[in-house]
């Protein structure tokens, strides 16, 4: 049974989400307190849905603490913060989805189901186990990236995006296709999702002096993973 943690200081939202997810067969743990959420973080949690604006401890703080604990729990922000810069910042923290209030509980359940299904499919896929490019090695089963035998920390979505691009080396892939194949939805309001993740991947490759290959922006069309010119 999938263990879901819901964190929101609005009890009515917590209650309705709990009702919907328990009906879907989830084991649900809830709290309306950010401080309490910090105590509930553990490897026993399979996925987390959390608000951002909460007294004392925000949704940002909870995610940062999760990273400090070296937990890799997929999470969805459910928030009234609707500005583009809010979405971008949440994605830089590694959010797997960003849903704005007011929201449809049914849509939230479906998005969560789809996220978990993609993760399960990705984790159990053995069609291609490994890609290698002049010292860069991507291992699909373990979701790890190494450069010259040094493992580079990556969030799951960063890895999946790089894997998708690298597995189609030299091809131009549109943002809409990347959104559909990596995130599982075609949501143009969140087109910056791809930009943010591409930027973070490039930073990691450059930080570790990986120069033979690069992710190239093809203006008006998309991105491609190719040998550096």
From Swiss-Prot:
It is found in: Cytoplasm. It comes from the Bacteria. SMART domains: REC (SM00448), Trans_reg_C (SM00862). GO terms for molecular function: phosphorelay response regulator activity; transcription cis-regulatory region binding. Its main location: cytoplasm. The modification 4-aspartylphosphate is found at residue 51. The keyword Phosphoprotein applies. Phosphorylated by SaeS. Residues 3-116 form the Response regulatory domain. Keywords: Cytoplasm, DNA-binding, Phosphoprotein, Sensory transduction, Transcription, Transcription regulation, Two-component regulatory system. GO terms for cellular component: cytosol; protein-DNA complex. Residues 128-227 bind DNA. The keyword Transcription applies. GO terms for biological process: regulation of DNA-templated transcription. Member of the two-component regulatory system SaeR/SaeS. Probably functions as a transcriptional regulator via a specific DNA-binding domain, recognizing motifs near the promoter sequences of target genes. This is Response regulator SaeR.
């Amino acid at each position: 049974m999938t263990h879901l943690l819901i964190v929101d200081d609005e009890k009515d939202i917590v209650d309705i989400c709990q009702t919907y997810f328990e009906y879907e067969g989830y084991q649900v743990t809830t709290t309306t307190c950010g401080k309490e959420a910090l105590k509930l973080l553990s490897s026993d949690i399979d996925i987390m849905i959390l608000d951002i604006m909460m007294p004392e401890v925000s949704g940002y703080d909870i995610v940062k603490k999760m990273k400090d604990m070296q937990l890799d729990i997929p999470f969805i922000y459910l928030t009234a913060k609707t500005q583009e810069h809010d979405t971008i910042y949440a994605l830089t923290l590694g959010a797997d989805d960003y849903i704005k209030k007011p929201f449809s509980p049914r849509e939230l359940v479906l998005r969560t189901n789809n996220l978990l299904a993609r993760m399960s499919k990705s984790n159990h896929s053995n069609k291609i186990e490994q890609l290698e490019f002049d010292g860069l090695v991507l291992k699909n089963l373990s979701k790890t990236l190494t450069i010259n035998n040094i493992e580079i920390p990556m969030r799951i979505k960063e890895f999946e995006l790089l894997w998708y691009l690298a597995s189609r080396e030299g091809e131009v892939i549109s943002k809409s296709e990347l959104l559909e194949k990596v995130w599982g939805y075609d949501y143009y309001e969140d087109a910056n999702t791809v930009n943010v993740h591409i930027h973070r991947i490039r930073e990691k490759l450059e930080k570790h002096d990986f120069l033979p290959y690069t992710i190239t922006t093809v203006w008006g069309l998309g991105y491609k993973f190719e040998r550096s010119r």
